[in-house]
Amino acid sequence: NWPMNQVCLKVIPALAVGCTMVLKPSELAPLSAIVLAELIDEAKFPKGVFNLVNGDGATTGDALTSHSDVNMISFTGSTRAGALISQNAAKDFKRVSLELGGKGANIVFKDADPEAIERGALRCFRNSGQSCNAPTRMLVEKSMYSEAIERLKKYANEFKVDDPNKEGEHIGPVISETQYNKIQTLIKKGIDEGANLVAGGPGKP
């Protein structure tokens, strides 16, 4: 997802209204949270107001969401993890705010603006396709179905994967080998279930 954005959306409002908090960032993307913690320390916040704890969800996350001193949990992540957090929170009626996986769709009619198809595809690819609010499918008017396929094929094949620190018109890799393998599994499943692959494919998400 968007590590610094997600962290700030949760941390800043909580601190602004006088709450104390514990932040556990994703174990795959902790650096933004560490930088923020250093800034908060430089700003001389009282000790204990903001607390950073690193670790994975299965151990650290489980311990935090089960702890009796935690009154509210705000979580952005997978539906599976959200269900586990809800179970922990229910034991002592913690308040919970969950932002979980979505299944957004693009809907494009014949009279849509000329760049609607490409813009919809861009929203899928943005952040290397790792945004929880990225569209997952496109529904197009039947009369322009073939045109939409060709335009999407051309647009998708123009994308290149390269070093995210370099400037240029490319996207970075996904965050981990585990995520890459998950994508490969989903591509294969789609093909096995009858999907017509027109861009990318096995080994090249």
Language-model features, listed with the residues they occupy:
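Rossmann-like NAD(P) dinucleotide-binding subdomain of oxidoreductase/dehydrogenase enzymes
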Residues: N1-A116
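ALDH superfamily catalytic-core signature
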Residues: M72, S78-P205
